């Protein structure tokens, strides 16, 4: 696996985080390379005046942030893992910290932006929210360039740039990536509420979903299956691990009203959605007793802290399909459960989580299954 990015007169050593053994994927892609080369070849830094800065949106592991270390820049991400990766790769490459501001996706953009570099995200609604925020701060002189894999740039993608920024065109493809150039036109664009709300009628819940929340348009059927098969017991400290909009943790709060529910996700928008949903749909006392944590799973949590962990594991990191996230979650759950504590998960049959749980816990049982999903229970033995 290549860790050295040699580009535009710089050599950067970049790692993906969290790090895993025998990593085969590098911490940048051809879209990063295309953006960096375009910036360098066109000497965009000469367009920066005093007190103006660069805005970077959706930098995955820090290639853009580290390359542009000499300039004042704000980096915006919805991913705790990405922000942590950027910090670690900054340290690895001895990049100065004083001219960098890292902020999450829920905050407004700075107003003194001259150059905007965007990595196209997987979720169109998230791109729209970022472009709507950008529309509020751009001027006719702002330079807006985006990059993404060819298969992620569609007419709908370009339509959003036309709507919120201005005249938009694309580059030729290189290494299966393409650039998007959008020339700002100052115009009135009606503000749109991009977060959506839908109901779970059976429970009389109204579910709020920010732009980048998993399954934001409907109730995830795997999550629904787990909600209907929660374990019976007198649980006091429960985790909804990888909580998304929080519906599994909410169901746990309804089933175990005296328990403290901890919602954990690496997406800032997910955690804020879960917080809003608890406050709107559960009794005040239960909502106030809940905890909401943006984190890389249970990393850094104390051992033997919880008696029930519920999980619908993701199998994507950025655009990469991986089972490493599930492995980490299961191992960390074993570490954080009390003796006789339970991990209950839902997953597609083909993911073969049962074998993983048996290897970690020494036991695993099928709680319920249907044609697509299986619910598994593993107990931490004394």
Swiss-Prot record:
Keyword Transport: no
EC top class named in words: transferase
Its EC number(s): 2.1.1.174
GO cellular component, one term: cytoplasm
Keywords from the UniProt entry: Cytoplasm, Methyltransferase, rRNA processing, S-adenosyl-L-methionine, Transferase
Localization in the cell: Cytoplasm
GO molecular function, one term: 23S rRNA (guanine(1835)-N(2))-methyltransferase activity
SUPFAM superfamilies: S-adenosyl-L-methionine-dependent methyltransferases (SSF53335)
Catalytic activity of the protein: guanosine(1835) in 23S rRNA + S-adenosyl-L-methionine = N(2)-methylguanosine(1835) in 23S rRNA + S-adenosyl-L-homocysteine + H(+)
Main localisation: cytoplasm
Domain of life of the source: Bacteria
InterPro entries tied to this protein: DNA_methylase_N6_adenine_CS, rRNA_m2G-MeTrfase_RlmG, RsmC/RlmG, SAM-dependent_MTases_sf, Small_mtfrase_dom
Family to which the UniProt record says this protein belongs: Belongs to the methyltransferase superfamily. RlmG family.
Function: Specifically methylates the guanine in position 1835 (m2G1835) of 23S rRNA.
The protein, known as: Ribosomal RNA large subunit methyltransferase G
Species in which this protein is naturally found: Psychromonas ingrahamii (strain DSM 17664 / CCUG 51855 / 37)
């Amino acid at each position: 696996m290549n860790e050295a990015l040699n580009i535009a007169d710089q050599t950067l050593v970049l790692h993906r985080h969290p790090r895993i053994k025998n990593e085969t994927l590098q911490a940048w892609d051809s879209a990063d390379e295309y953006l960096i080369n375009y910036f360098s070849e066109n000497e965009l830094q000469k367009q920066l005046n005093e007190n103006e800065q660069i805005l970077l949106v959706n930098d995955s592991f820090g290639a853009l942030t580290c390359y542009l270390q000499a300039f004042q820049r704000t980096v915006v991400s919805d991913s705790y893992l990405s922000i942590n990766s950027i910090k670690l790769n900054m340290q690895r490459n001895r990049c100065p910290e004083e001219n960098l501001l890292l902020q999450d996706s829920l905050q407004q953009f700075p107003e003194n932006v001259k150059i905007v570099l965007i990595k196209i995200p997987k979720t169109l609604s998230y791109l729209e929210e970022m472009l709507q925020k950008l529309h509020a701060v751009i001027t006719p002189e702002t330079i807006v360039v985006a990059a993404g894999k060819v298969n992620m740039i569609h007419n709908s993608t370009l339509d959003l740039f036309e709507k919120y920024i201005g005249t938009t065109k694309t580059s030729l493809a290189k290494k299966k990536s393409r650039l998007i150039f959008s020339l700002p036109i100052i115009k009135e664009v009606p503000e749109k509420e991009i977060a959506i709300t839908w109901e779970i009628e059976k429970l009389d819940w109204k579910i709020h979903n920010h732009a980048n929340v998993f399954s934001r348009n409907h109730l995830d059927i795997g999550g629904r299956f787990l909600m209907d098969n929660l374990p019976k017991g007198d649980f006091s400290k429960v985790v909804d691990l990888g909580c998304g909009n929080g519906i599994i943790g909410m169901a746990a709060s309804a089933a175990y009203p005296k328990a403290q529910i901890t919602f954990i996700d690496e997406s800032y928008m997910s955690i804020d959605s879960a917080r809003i949903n608890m406050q709107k749909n559960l009794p005040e006392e239960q909502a106030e007793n809940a905890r909401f944590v943006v984190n890389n799973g249970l990393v850094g949590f104390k051992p033997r802290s919880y008696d029930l962990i519920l999980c619908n594991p993701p199998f994507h990191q950025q655009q990469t399909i991986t089972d490493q996230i599930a492995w980490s979650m299961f191992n960390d759950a074993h570490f954080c459960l009390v003796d006789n504590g339970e991990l209950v998960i839902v997953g597609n049959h083909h993911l073969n989580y049962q074998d993983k749980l048996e290897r970690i816990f020494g036991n695993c049982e099928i709680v319920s299954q249907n044609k697509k999903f299986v619910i598994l229970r593993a107990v931490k033995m004394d």
